[in-house]
Amino acid sequence: MKGRLLQRLRQLSISNSLRGAFLTGALLTLIVSMVSLYSWHEQSSQVRYSLDEYFPRIHSAFLIEGNLNLAVDQLNEFLLAPNTTVRLQLRTQIIQHLDKIERLSQGLQLAERRQLAVILQDSRTLLAELDNALYNMFLVREKVSELSARIDWLHDDFTTELNSLVQDFTWQQGTLLDQIEANQGDAAQYLQRSREVQNEQQQVYTLARIENQIVDDLRDRLNELKSGNNDGMLVETHIRYLENLKKTADENIRALDDWPSTITLRQTIDELLEIGMVKNKMPDTMRDYVAAQKALLDASRAREATLGRFRTLLEAQLGSSHQQMQTFNQRLEQIVRVSGGLILVATLLALLLAWGLNHYFIRSRLVKRFTALNQAVVQIGLGRTDSTIPVYGRDELGRIARLLRHTLGQLNMQRRQLEQEVAERKEIEADLRAMQDELIQTAKLAVVGQTMTTLAHEINQPLNALSMYLFTAGRAIEQGQSGQARNTLTKAEGLINRIDAIIRSLRQFTRRAELETPLYPVDLRQTFVAAWELLAMRHQSRQGALSLPTDTVWVSGDEVRIQQVLVNVLANALDACSHDAVIAVTWQTQGEALEVYIADNGPGWPVALLPSLLKPFTTSKAVGLGIGLSISVSLMAQMKGDLRLASTLTRNACVVLQFSVTDVDDVE
């Protein structure tokens, strides 16, 4: 089964195999992507819940709790406010905190906002009740303070009056004792009067004791009110106690009706009893105090209940958010575990697929064959067209190998054809060069032939003079005139040197130039002079003149070729001028090149032939082959120079030659 599967895999083409591997990888990637996307979606949901709901709720809850704590602290200060101004300021601050809590509740859920709104409304109502209870308590305390001050004032008046009476009683008794001692006869009368004073004093002391009991009871009741240890039952007991004291006081007061000095004391006791017993005074004050204290206590209990509802709501909200967050976390952990397992399985399958693809397909079917094919291509690239391509098969690599073998066969055939064509072209080029060389040599011989008459004349004159000098030298020797003979022979030697220079110049010009002759420094001005001397017959008959610069320049080239070019150019210039030919030569350096301008005073270039003057067999002369300029162009190219045609400002013909400048050091 495994071998059959491997065989089926080997029969698949590379594209189908790669397509199958790509589809499998894409399927695994799709599975991993879907699982990852689902996990990402769940994580994103939890993050959105955390950012949009959980953290805002927690933040709002903490802010609400913070403002609630501030409100509680200020409420405690509100309960202990020393005056109405401070209480009103604290009430305003508490209301502001409640309003802020209401604004912060917008971050909670709807049900929680509704519950919190009810609690806030109850809190505002409770705050109003507390404020009312505190206000009533403040009024009652003011009234209690007034009663306490009134009792103290009456007690002080009673004490002052009592002290005055006691002093008066003491004075009366002292006076009576003095009178008894002074008037023994009226002693009984004075003793009776002394007993009456003592009886009055005793009644006054009884009133003082009753007054002290009344004051102590009133003060005790008021202190009990202030300490919060009183209730409605004690008020009734207080009234009954004062009624008993009033009965006792009335009995004593009736006994004092005969003593007008005690009227003030009796009135003070009546006022104290009125304070303690009249309904709209101390009894109502005590009842109002107890009621206000009870209302304040009830409001405080309601405050604790409201705060408990606040905290219960906040704890429930925090607990609900925390529970929901835990549920999200547990669900996300489960999803992460499942998705992680799926991703792990898909990763293992992808690794298994990659290993199988690499082991059974890439290494065996692709890498080895690609390597062999690459080595064959490298050998072909190195020029080894006889290399073999050892790759076969029916897949893409096999087809590429077959195409490459076919292409290699065609390349070999084309290479052989190209080699044959190159050999033929080399033969043709050699023939062309030989023919060009023959043409150059023919042109040289034509120039020599044209100058033979001048050369014969130039050589004939020195020969005639030489014959005469030799005859003169012989006669001088016969006559023994050795000095004259020596001078004559010296002149003859100069003529021989002149003839030798003419012959050498002619031989130098007619020497065949070798194509492979290396370039060397050439004195361009001297070469111009030599070429001009070769054309002496022509320029003398036309009264020609050659103008050369005075400076010496050295160029890179071959003297024979340069002389041939100059002879062709100067001959054309002389032919263009019928008489009085003037040929002006100038040169200038352009970087590493020397440009030579050769201009004549002839009619200029023929416009009709100007585009083809540098082509072979193009001439405006009646007699001539028209190959001089084309040969000159070829010779300049061989010396890495150039020849161009131009015109002067006066429309005379001008030939521009370009040479490479040679250093003086190279010349030396």
Curated annotation (Swiss-Prot):
<keyword id="KW-0812">Transmembrane</keyword>
<keyword id="KW-1133">Transmembrane helix</keyword>
<keyword id="KW-0418">Kinase</keyword>
<keyword id="KW-0472">Membrane</keyword>
<dbReference type="InterPro" id="IPR017116">
    <property type="entry name" value="Sig_transdc_His_kinase_PgtB"/>
</dbReference>
<keyword id="KW-0902">Two-component regulatory system</keyword>
<dbReference type="InterPro" id="IPR036890">
    <property type="entry name" value="HATPase_C_sf"/>
</dbReference>
<feature type="modified residue" description="Phosphohistidine; by autocatalysis">
    <location>
        <position position="457"/>
    </location>
</feature>
<feature type="domain" description="HAMP">
    <location>
        <begin position="364"/>
        <end position="416"/>
    </location>
</feature>
<keyword id="KW-0597">Phosphoprotein</keyword>
<keyword id="KW-1003">Cell membrane</keyword>
<dbReference type="InterPro" id="IPR036097">
    <property type="entry name" value="HisK_dim/P_sf"/>
</dbReference>
<feature type="transmembrane region" description="Helical">
    <location>
        <begin position="20"/>
        <end position="40"/>
    </location>
</feature>
<keyword id="KW-0067">ATP-binding</keyword>
<keyword id="KW-0808">Transferase</keyword>
<dbReference type="GO" id="GO:0005886">
    <property type="term" value="C:plasma membrane"/>
</dbReference>
<dbReference type="InterPro" id="IPR005467">
    <property type="entry name" value="His_kinase_dom"/>
</dbReference>
<dbReference type="Pfam" id="PF02518">
    <property type="entry name" value="HATPase_c"/>
</dbReference>
<keyword id="KW-0997">Cell inner membrane</keyword>
<protein>
    <recommendedName>
        <fullName>Phosphoglycerate transport system sensor protein PgtB</fullName>
        <ecNumber>2.7.13.3</ecNumber>
    </recommendedName>
</protein>
<dbReference type="Pfam" id="PF00672">
    <property type="entry name" value="HAMP"/>
</dbReference>
<dbReference type="InterPro" id="IPR003661">
    <property type="entry name" value="HisK_dim/P_dom"/>
</dbReference>
<feature type="domain" description="Histidine kinase">
    <location>
        <begin position="454"/>
        <end position="663"/>
    </location>
</feature>
<dbReference type="GO" id="GO:0005524">
    <property type="term" value="F:ATP binding"/>
</dbReference>
<dbReference type="InterPro" id="IPR003660">
    <property type="entry name" value="HAMP_dom"/>
</dbReference>
<feature type="transmembrane region" description="Helical">
    <location>
        <begin position="342"/>
        <end position="362"/>
    </location>
</feature>
<comment type="function">
    <text>Member of the two-component regulatory system PgtB/PgtA that regulates the inducible phosphoglycerate transport system. Activates PgtA by phosphorylation.</text>
</comment>
<keyword id="KW-0547">Nucleotide-binding</keyword>
<dbReference type="GO" id="GO:0000155">
    <property type="term" value="F:phosphorelay sensor kinase activity"/>
</dbReference>
<dbReference type="Pfam" id="PF00512">
    <property type="entry name" value="HisKA"/>
</dbReference>
